[in-house]
Every structure is written in C-alpha cells, then in structure tokens.
Amino acid sequence: MKYLVLYRDYKRYADAGKEALSARQALFDTLTCQATSRDTIIGCPVIGETSHACNWQLAGYHRETNPRLAKRKNLVFIPYAATTANATPRSVERILFSAHEDLAVDWTCTPMLQELVAKAIGVEATAVATTQNDKRYSEDYGEILFSNLGRHYLLDSMFGPIPPDECLLPYAKQEIVNHAHQNFLLTLWGYGGHWSYPDRYPEKHAVFKPCNAQYWGHSVDPHDKRIQALRNAFDNTIYHTDYVLNSVISILEHCGKSSFLVYVADHGENIYNTEDMLFLHASYLGTHQENHVSLLFWFSDGYIKKHRKEVDYIKEHQRIPVMSIDVYHTILQLFELQTPWFDSTQSLASGAYCEHKNQQMYNGAHQIQPAPPFPQEERMSIDSILAASR
C-alpha cells in the first residue's frame, strides 16, 4: 500500500516532541475501520487556508469570484459554516481529527481522518499540500502527524514565496489517475488566501485591480484607498481557488468513477472591515470575518446515482448553522466507512445530524469564546441565493 505525503508545518506540533510518536503508533495499531460500500469511491477533501465565505460569489457576493464553480452542476455550497478557531493550528487540527462541540481534541490519542481511511479495507490515502518556509519544523510536524501514512515527501520553499495552489494540480491528476481503479482518498491542503495575497495567485488571475497590496499596520483611515487594493488582491485569491477546485473536479469527472470533493477553509480574514479596523486573522477576540468560512461539496453523477440519500441530506443542511468539525464525520459517511469513531450526529450526510446550538471558537488569545453574531445583511444576501436555487 502506497502513501504519498507532501506536507506543511506548524511549530505547535513540533514542540509536542517525539514522545507523541509512540502514542500515535499504539493508537494506529488498534484502529478499526472498514469500507462497507460495494462501489469504488474516490474522495477528495480540500483544506483551504484563509477564505471568508461572504467574499464568495456562491454566497451572494457582488463580484464574480467563482465564475467556474457557479456553472457547475452537482455542487452544494454550505453558506452558514463556521470554523472552530481563527488560526490554522487549532482549526485544521479539528478538521483532520474528531472533535466535539466543546472543541476538545487530543491529537495524540485521536485518529486522523486519513489514518481511519488507511485502515479501511481496500482504501488508500494520499495527502498533498503546500508547505511553510521553516524546514526544521516541517520535518518534525510531518514525522509526528503523518507517521502512520508511509513515505513522506517535502516540497519546500525555503527562500521564496509559497507557490500558488495550482502547483497541487499535477500531483492531484497523477494520484487520481493512478488510483482510479480502487477506493482512494486524496487530501489537498492549499495556502488559499493567506497573506501575502499577491503571492497567492498567478498574474493571469489578477482580475480585480488595482491589487498591489501592501501591509502597513493596523491603525488606518477607513477611507484609505490602499484598503481597496488589499480587498481586490484577497478576492483574486478566491478567484484562483475557484480555478483550482474546478480543475480538480474536472480530473475527478474524467476518471469516470463515483467521486466527491469537499472544500473547507480553515478560517476567514479581516481586511479592515471590522469596527476596530483589524487586519489578517488570529485576533484576540475572534470576529465574524474570521469565523465564517467557505464549505462546499461536489458529487459526480455516478456517486449521486448510488448514494442519493447522503447527497440529499447535505442539501437539507444548507440552511442551518454547521461547523468545520462536521467535515470529519461527513467524509467517513460519504465513504461508507464503519468505525467506532464515526458520529452520525456530526455528519451532514446523515438524517441524524444535530445542529450546533452553541457555536464556539478558539481565538488568538488561546481562549474559547462564543461564535460572533452573523450580520443580518449577509444573512439576507445568502437567503436570497438559497431561495433562487430552489
């Protein structure tokens, strides 16, 4: 069984130390997970960095930031999705690992989604991701987190900007084509709309101009013309994400198998659009702009034909508040994997799904706070889109 892992780093995992390796190995050895579907399924979760949902055309945004995805059939956008943290280490941790509504998770004794899939009979797992710049932390993080997924490969950008997410596409095509005959999970982890925005897309995707964005501090005049350049550049990152996701969908379509794609952003972004003119993310008091994230599903015709019930349940949950932690259990159900770690009340593909009544998030002060209120203006825009899609 082959696992190709190109990964990115987070110092927090490296600081946990090598002693975590033995604990994770013991957990992996005792995992139970079985694929029950007679169908051959290819699943592709895509973790995107830094994307505020209300800058997406699919959520009613006034700009065409999703011109390709907007034309896609079999695509379900979840407009009321919230993250669990406004910084990547905590938020992605709760996407890859099973977490409860109180946000509790211990990654040293909780199986990663990819590990459960790897344990399932006849299912392989591949993870391809962009990387951070510090190779020392990358190596430690990869050794600890992906220790049970076989061979590791590091694509590093030691002295230059991290390449745009389109660099993932050749690997995605190669892996999907090579595994088109079997159950397969491909995880893509991009850098999305993370700062510096102009580095996150090629020139051909600089459609909103001017976009010569530069960071100059947190205290600015709300009428400063430079703010619009920042917002233009951020919208260009979403335009590029639209291109990347549409390209992956085309690859999945071409393989002709039952397949699905799930995209979820780890957190949103402040671009001088809060009352106290915040910029970037990981603020000490989490904002709506950081909390409201993009979440979507795409399904092939073949998948819908054989798994219509699961797809219909996901559509039913478009109109209620959901959280990024739901992705873990939803993917397990879309793959029809049986494991004690599966919780149907946290799967959007289940009729037993329970709405999150008390949404919470970790903020930059490393504290849990209530999720910020959803602005009425944004809610009205989203509701109009949902009404038009009926």
Model-derived regions, located:
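Active-site-proximal alpha/beta segments of enzymes that process anionic O-linked groups
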Residues: 1-217, 292, 324, 329-350, ...
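Hydrophobic, well-ordered secondary-structure elements that form the walls
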Residues: 245-248, 266, 295, 327, ...
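A structural motif corresponding to the C-terminal end of an alpha-helix
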Residues: 117-122, 244-257, 298
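A short beta-strand-to-alpha-helix junction
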Residues: 104-110, 228-239, 282-291, 304-331, ...
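Histidine-centered active-site microenvironments of extracellular/periplasmic hydrolases
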Residues: 60-64, 251-253, 257-258, 262-310, ...
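Conserved beta-strand->loop/alpha-helix structural units within folded catalytic cores of enzymes
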Residues: 48-50, 241-244, 259-267
